[in-house]
């Protein structure tokens, strides 16, 4: 073997050749604007396809009196949040596929999967029905979870469904990184407990006041938990939003912020 070290330049002296401009300019699709008069026809009775409506922007106020939708226990993957299998035929119809919301999630109070108690009428039913009821009657709801919430495949529907059904906040001990970002993209406030043991303070029938009106990068969020017996608990939560992600939240979603 030669006794001398290989010789050569670590990087090209004149930099790398790039022809991005040529690529962009050669394809009208990169520079043209969509035709606002173009009509996409979807059968009104289609079960598979539904035109998406933009999510509403945040009104700038604290979230108050948010009812607890579900307190999940243990592992809660994206498949627990939005099951695949036969549900995939509805992936182009947000209203229909949202009926699988948290079907596999374990209710921390009962040990049942996908069934919760509606605090407005005491009925026990699927999570999506209660979420829809809270959205219509209370303006939204909150999900409380344990560690690594949203682990598994990075399916967007696991964030789009709760957003569609009015979930405003997900408060967890920790998040799977990609799902946390997906929640941010859909305009849901993703928070973690500063003290993970505060998870134990959450009781069935609780409502939440989330002080997010003054949200800034790196600042904690104060939460007041109201219990059915009239007592309260104060909880400090934290977030990982940067300036761009806060703009997503304010606009209602990342897409709306574009």
Label every PLM stretch briefly:
Residues 1-258:
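Fe-S-dependent hydro-lyases/dehydratases of central metabolism
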């Amino acid at each position: 073997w030669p006794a001398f070290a290989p010789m050569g330049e670590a990087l090209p002296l004149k930099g790398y050749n790039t022809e991005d401009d040529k690529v962009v300019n050669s394809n009208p699709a990169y520079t043209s604007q969509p035709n606002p008069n173009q009509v996409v026809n979807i059968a009104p009775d289609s079960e598979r396809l539904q035109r998406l409506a933009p999510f509403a922007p945040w009104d700038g106020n604290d979230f108050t009196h948010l009812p607890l939708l579900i307190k999940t226990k243990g592992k809660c993957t994206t498949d627990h949040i939005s099951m695949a299998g036969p549900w995939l035929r509805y992936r182009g119809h947000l209203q229909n596929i949202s009926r699988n919301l948290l079907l596999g999630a374990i209710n921390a109070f009962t040990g049942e999967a996908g069934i919760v108690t509606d605090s407005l009428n005491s009925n026990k039913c699927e999570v999506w029905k209660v979420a829809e009821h809270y959205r219509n009657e209370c303006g939204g709801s909150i999900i409380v979870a344990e560690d690594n919430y949203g682990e598994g495949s990075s399916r967007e529907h696991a964030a789009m469904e709760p957003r569609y059904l009015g979930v405003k906040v997900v408060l967890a001990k920790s998040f799977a990184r990609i799902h946390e970002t997906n929640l941010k993209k859909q305009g849901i406030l993703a928070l973690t407990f500063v003290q993970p043991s505060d998870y134990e303070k959450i009781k069935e029938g609780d409502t939440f006041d989330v002080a997010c009106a003054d949200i800034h990068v790196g600042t904690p969020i104060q939460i007041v938990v109201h219990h059915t017996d009239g007592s309260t608990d104060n909880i400090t939560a934290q977030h990982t939003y940067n300036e761009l992600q806060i703009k997503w939240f304010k606009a209602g979603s990342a897409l709306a912020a574009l």
